[in-house]
Amino acid sequence: MKNFLTSILPGQGVYFITSIKAGACRNHSCRTIHEMVRKAHELDAHGYDVFFACASFKEESHIDADGKRRQRTGENAGCAKSFWLDIDCGPDKAAEGKGYAIIKEALAALQAFIIAVGLPMPIIVFSGGGLHVY
């Protein structure tokens, strides 16, 4: 996990892991990628679904224009190292025009896009409901 996160995340800033369990969502700030990995393993061991932010942030939290404390906002975004895509798959997503019916179709479209734009081969993660591409 550390190699993956190091390859897609910037080398500076505040990082976030998000945990979800029984409908409750919580952000956990981390100062290093090593700390992110440790926190992700800890939360996973306690039955949480664990996600990560694809950018780093300037601060652990900030006060927005409405006086509310916020964490992972565009205003607080610090750095990004990579581009990322979340490609949804499934018959319902395809019927709504919001994704591809099957993974094979999504991979073919992704390959055509990469060739057309001239991007390097990405890291592809099968997310369960589609593809995460970095």
For each predicted feature, which ranges?
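Histidine-centered divalent-metal-coordination microenvironment in nucleic-acid enzymes
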Residues: 82-85, 112-134
